[in-house]
């Protein structure tokens, strides 16, 4: 899937200003052409979902094995106001699956277009973010879709935890 480690960049002027030996930042602007680390969370959570469904060990798994293990067409759904939805859409496309991304009212057309370019269905609701999250959950349950939401609530913590674990892979 085109993985490349992203570089560490030295901020020499800033380290001199603060009188420290070195300040390094991780440059995520080249991450799969998405310019954001957020895709790490959604893609990791989707991989974990698939590993759970197909009894695979995520610690000993190639992308090709994961993709070839999928036995049925799946749809991944989420609510976003930007980069998380792009990450879910990107991961679904890489795996040959569907993504339906809901966005709250007032979402920028540029962000909608970025999700559409990744092959996902993108629907802007007339609701605020929290209501859109609830709507996404209800719609996904009704349609048999997998929700990959980065927001946790009582009874829904496993996938948001996986998303956070995916963000942590940035340091690997």
What are these regions (language model features)?
Residues 1-172:
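PLP-dependent amino-acid enzyme catalytic core
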